[in-house]
Amino acid sequence: QGWKTYWKSPGDGGFAQKMTWDNSTNVKNVNILWPTPIEFEILGLTSLGYENDVIFPLEIELEDEFKNTFLNLHVTYLICKEVCIPGDATVFLEIPSGEKKLTNNYFELEKALSLLPDEDFNSSYVNKINLNTFYDDKDSIIQLIVESEKSFFSPKIFLHSPFGLPVVKNTINYSDDNKIITTNFNFDNDLILDKNFPL
């Protein structure tokens, strides 16, 4: 209990899980699907990730669906509590061609998929997202304006960037009917511009 691992944009500390599948057969691509993270502090650093347990569903794209598949997946990861421990593991999986059948892990997988952020505007009721960036002598600001068919109640908004943005507290302003929110992420220029983060 209490062990943590990291989201795809981990924040100030840690690193996300990384995978390679070089020695696989009939595998074109493997994509990690990331459940909605939580924010936590560890060793004085604010990060985004998961606590105690998490399942990362994998989306595997085959080169030919009518051929047998052998997955040789190498994973590197980091888990933290009072200390951080890096680790690695290799997973082997044979996927025969032919009729598809449900496995004993089907319900666990469905549960994990239900924890993924909804990227479908139609099912999430989000109509529009505008992204703006500003900066002055002190701060660089990423602003999101989100419009929805339904009212927002305590939304959680996380920024993903391949450039390793630090985690900062965002401010949220609501329209009178709570169907439009404006949220600002303010980054200290010393943390952003000096490291050449593109905004």
Please give the residue ranges for each predicted region.
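Extracellular/lumen-exposed scaffold segments
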Residues: Q1-L199
